[in-house]
Amino acid sequence: MLKLLLIDGSNYLFRAYHALPPLTTSTGEPTGAIKGFLGMLSRVHTLAKPDMAAVIFDAPGKTFRHEMYPEYKANRPPMPDDLRVQIDPLEKVVAALGWKVLIVPGIEADDVIGSLSAMAKREGVKSVVATGDKDLSQLVDDDVVILNTMNTKFYDRAGVIEKYGVPPERMIDYLALMGDKVDNVPGIKGCGPKTAAKWVAEFGGIDAIRAAAPAMKGKIGENLRAGLPFLDEAVALVTVKCDAEIPGVKSLADLSFAPGDA
């Protein structure tokens, strides 16, 4: 069966930047993130052996999530200058190597990945999502697996359950309960991975947890009841969009490798 590789370029970029010591050209231009990224790209291509592929980056500017919740990602520090200046040349090099580079304004890289994986299902193609972002685990099913950037392991449904304690179809509930400090999404105070997984295992989704909240005892019960008003918004913020139109990609044929690419 044909296979589509979707690379979370923004996630890879930051990991590459922090993985290597600062490197520069003879004229002082930083290149460490570029070098690290290209090495990771080569490794993941070898591991996944795709027939089609795309590297997806976040677009600059705000997205529909900022419209839903203006404080979304408000606590993030600005991108370091020595990383920012590497983005444009990196995108050009990746494209020159034969990869399809996608940047879609108004949505995040996660949403492009989700929408392309949905397109792949419609076309009968399996997807490999290369990322270190736990949010994308919600996409995993019989047609989608995660290739973790940290340990180069593939995670199917059983792998997601083993790693997080919840199945992929409950990852949205799990993520909403915990919130996300990096993205400034409030969760239930004091609810970490173990508590979130316990509630999901015991009660099920957010609606069932909400129904059980009045009977929950102790401080964590108080925290849950206090956080209930925001839970629906948290669910919306952590849900990956899977129905976005991707400019330049009408079918997976637009993501095919030509002979000698990559």
Regions found by a protein language model. Name each.
Residues 13-18, 63-64, 88-91, 197-199:
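A broad, low-specificity signal for short, low-complexity segments enriched in glycine/proline
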Residues 2, 23-24, 74-249:
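Extended two-metal-dependent nuclease catalytic cores across DNA- and RNA-processing enzymes
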Residues 1-54, 58, 64-68:
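Non-catalytic, usually N-terminal nucleic-acid engagement modules in DNA/RNA processing proteins
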Residues 71:
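Arg/Lys-rich, often Gly-containing low-complexity segments of ribosomal proteins
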Residues 63-65, 137-138:
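Short catalytic/ligand-binding loop motif for oxyanion handling, primarily in non-cytosolic enzymes
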Residues 254-262:
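Short, intrinsically disordered, charge-balanced linker/junction segments flanking boundaries
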